[in-house]
From Swiss-Prot:
This is Integration host factor subunit beta. PROSITE patterns: HISTONE_LIKE. The gene is ihfB. This protein is one of the two subunits of integration host factor, a specific DNA-binding protein that functions in genetic recombination as well as in transcriptional and translational control. Pfam families: Bac_DNA_binding (PF00216).
């Protein structure tokens, strides 16, 4: 699912809201999550999961084409840990061995 599909589904479930208003709300939520992560804050949505930033130290890498060693700078990467309720629902709705689909 892409963001526009998410906006459309939320608008369909809330006919009293205009789709452009839903889009503005979704964008505002995502912007606030990104801003909080940029400040170094952790964002926790109970039952859904928690967003945080992990810091990767500088390291020595290798150019796969030439084999030459190259320095890789330290970097910050976003990290998401699912909440307990989400994990339970995913495991209940998609038992082990069931085929995954990209719907």
């Amino acid at each position: 699912m892409i963001k526009s599909e998410l906006v459309q589904r939320i608008a369909e479930h809330n006919p009293h809201l205009y789709q452009r208003d839903v889009e503005n709300i979704v964008n505002a939520i995502l912007d606030e999550i990104v801003a909080a992560l940029a400040r170094g804050d952790r964002v926790e949505l109970r039952g859904f999961g928690a967003f945080s930033v992990k810091h990767r130290p500088a390291r020595a890498g290798r150019n796969p084409r030439t084999g030459a060693h190259v320095p890789v700078d330290q970097k910050s990467v976003p990290f998401f840990k699912t909440g307990k309720e989400m994990r339970e629902r995913l495991n209940r709705d998609n038992p082990a061995g069931a085929a995954d689909t990209d719907d």
